[in-house]
Amino acid sequence: FQVSNAYLRTRQAVIEKLEEAINFHDFKTRASLGDVYEQLLNDLRGAGNAGEFYTPRAITQFMADRVNPSLARRETVMDPACGTGGFLTAAVDHFRNQLSTKSSAADKAAIETLLRGIEKKPLPHLLCTTNMLLHGIDVPSQIEHKNTLNIGWNDWSANDKVDCVITNPPFGGYEDDGVGSDYPADLRTRETADMFMALIVKKLLKENGRAAVVLPDGFLFGDGIKATLKKLLLRDCKLHTIVRLPKGVFAPYTTIKTNLLFFTKGATVDDGSEHFHTDTIWYYEHPYPPGYKSYSKTKPIRFEEFKPEQDWWGSEANDFADRVESEFAWKVDFKTRREQAEAAAQPHWDRAEQLGNQASTLENRVRDLRDSIKGVSNAQQRRPLEDEIDTLRTQAEGLRLQARDAQAAGDRLYWPIYNLDLKNPNAPEEETHDPDVLLDKYKTLLDQIDETENRLKSELAAALAHHFTTEEADQ
């Protein structure tokens, strides 16, 4: 539409003109504006602005599609690091696709109540709120502006749990000192993505709740706190699928390879044992489209590329019994790996416990002797007691060292099972050659090049000589 400069002098005039030109109450118009808005966010990402906030739409669509939140069952969806709201708008679209001509007004109104997002930074929070408005969420009050990770560990209640979590938590960053200081000691970290994973598993998902999370390769192969988190994930949840994405999906923001982890929160098993809900993990290696060597701004990943994954996916209801291995898909028997590792490590752990108990017995004896020596003033009587204390303390320290060595030996056999950075065993093998053979071939090729060069020089010299001889004869 055309307006004169006079109408553009004040913000209110611009808003009034927009209201005249655009019917914001028309759903189709708002949906179109929502698409335009998301494209603008994509362009900002490609230009290097707000890049940390945007996940490619193909990824948000695919993850929402696979988690499959149900409108009929009124399943709630949360993104605890919602950025500009890409996952939430994908959930909105997924809910709306479940509407039909028979759907009630209550069904349509329910969509707005089933969403929750939390964003730490003001700009992406504003962009997210706008995004939700343009996608037909009239009162996006459920998009909160605060730091999810700064909420006290014990401040999360059962009412905060949701049916579905779909998110791309910031990875590679660290929270300020003090954030997460009340997390359980074995889960305490400042790495942002790790903190989100602890929250999702322990605080956000209901029993049988489903999640899809974007995580880098570093989470899959990481040890230390990451290994502890993966044990928590595999124990408390059923990690059924890892989609491995190629490089460049999130370029230019990052070229780090990323993965989509899909898992379901298991029911609590209170039988005194350490029950693991994950038995089998399926992997799917997403390939580049034919002719692609990477993704870029002009060649982004597309939702249509995930059609093979959708066709292969199957149903969790029958434990994905219809899945088959292929050039891109393979499964890992995690239960067998875990049981074998535990069996190999257990003797070392038992030995560590035995040595620790022996050390504790000696340390208790040392404490008793120290208590008894307090009432002995005679130096001659004290000396043998002090000597015994020194001997027992030395023996206890030696046992503690042996116990630590035994524990470490068991840990070295056990903890590698939590390296989930597993390569595709079904991929075509790359051709390899012996370096010595290649070097010999290279030398032979150089000799052939030299021989050809010398032959050309000889022929050129002969041709020039013939040319000059002919000229002299003509003269």
Q: How should each PLM-predicted stretch be described?
A:
Residues Q2, A47-F53:
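Nucleic-acid modification enzymes, centered on SAM-dependent nucleic-acid methyltransferases
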